[in-house]
Every structure is written in C-alpha cells, then in structure tokens.
Amino acid sequence: MSGGLAPSKSTVYVSNLPFSLTNNDLYRIFSKYGKVVKVTIMKDKDTRKSKGVAFILFLDKDSALNCTRAINNKQLFGRVIKASIAIDNGRAAEFIRRRNYFDKSKCYECGESGHLSYACPKNMLGEREPPKKKEKKKKRKLPEPEEEIEEVEVSEEEGEDPALDSLSQAIAFQQAKIEEEQSKWRPNPGGPSTSDDSRRPRIKKSAYFSDEEELSD
C-alpha cells in the first residue's frame, strides 16, 4: 500500500440506508471491515434529514473492497443495501479534508446542547467512544544560564595578553620573551658546542622597552 489516502479507490458508496442511522452508527457498522477514516451522510439542505446515502472512506482500498463484497445486496435493518466503490468526481481532496467543529456546546447530529454526537440519543447503536486526542509535543526550552558565559582565555600562542595595558607590564612581558628566545639557542650543559651555536648571534638584553633588539658580535 502506498503512503497517503486514495479516496478514489478506498471510498464506498452506500445507498438505501435507513434514514434513522447516524454517522456514529455507520462508523460502528463499517468498522468491522477495516479502519474507517470518515463517514459522510448525504442530508437534505432544508430539513437536515438523511437521504439514505452515505460515503464511507477507508484507510486502504483492500478494506473498501472487502466491505462492498460483504454488504452489497445484504439486508440491514430490513432494507437491502447497495454498496460499491465510489466514482471520483474530482472532489476527492475536498472530501478527505478534515472538518473542525469549533462549537462544542451542541451536538451536530441533532443540534441539541448538553452532549456531543458520540453520545447522541439518536444513535440507534448507542454511544460510541470518542477518539483519543493527540497530545501535542511541547518544545523543550533550553535552561537559562545562571551565570554569564566566561570569556575565552587567549593562549600565548594566539597573541599577547590584552591585559597588558601598562608600560611596566609590557616591559616585563617583552623581557620574558627575550629570555625564552635565548633559552632555545643555549647549548646543553656538558655537551660539545657546535659550529652552528657559535655562529648564532647573541641577543643583548635591552634596558628599555623597544621593538628593536640589540645584537652583539
């Protein structure tokens, strides 16, 4: 079975129904043949009374075919029922559209207040259990942080610490860089000196803060 409803193949046209049967009655009668999605009874525009004709939309075409074979030319409440696969008149999309009944104070079957159609006294087969409401999934909100996000610390490899805002701090920082640079060129204690070590220039510590470095011969 392909995904989605196919009303042109899964809708049963039923005629010669008893006029007293309600939507809920037909739902209970035809549910034995498969999953019923929608029941539509044709009614008179003025009197709102049933014309004895209904469309039963099943979830799949196999259920609709089983229904027509089982109920066609069979008696129901003393009447011979006619059932067949409905002919698509081009309004299939409109037919399967779900209707929302916003006024929950009155029964849409009889128009009286105090009950809904599921428990309408005119249901010949008694009350029907209403469908369960689908629970809406609530979006989980991210918890608000109790403290402000800490600033990311800048490592020495990424650049100078921006906190060096005074001259004394800048001098100390520059001096540490010079000493670190000298330690890289300093030979291991007790090890023989190489010709490369003697050729490398020695950096002379500057007495003041400067971008230039003094080299000694």
Curated annotation (Swiss-Prot):
CDD domains: RRM_ZCRB1. Component of the U11/U12 snRNPs that are part of the U12-type spliceosome. Interacts with ZRSR1. Pfam families: RRM_1, zf-CCHC. Keywords: Metal-binding, mRNA processing, mRNA splicing, Nucleus, Phosphoprotein, RNA-binding, Spliceosome, Zinc, Zinc-finger. The keyword Zinc applies. SMART domains: RRM, RRM_1, ZnF_C2HC. The modification Phosphoserine is found at S155, S210, S216. Residues 120-217 are annotated as: Disordered. Disulfide bonds: none annotated. One of its GO terms (cellular component) is U12-type spliceosomal complex. One of its GO terms (biological process) is mRNA splicing, via spliceosome. Residues 145-163 have a biased composition (Acidic residues). The keyword Zinc applies. It is found in: Nucleus, Nucleoplasm. Transmembrane segments: none annotated. Its main location: nucleus. SUPFAM superfamilies: Retrovirus zinc finger-like domains, RNA-binding domain, RBD. This is Zinc finger CCHC-type and RNA-binding motif-containing protein 1. Residues 10-88 form the RRM domain. GO terms for molecular function: RNA binding; zinc ion binding. A zinc finger (CCHC-type) spans 105-122. Expressed at higher level in heart and testis, and at lower level in cerebellum. Weakly expressed at low level in liver.
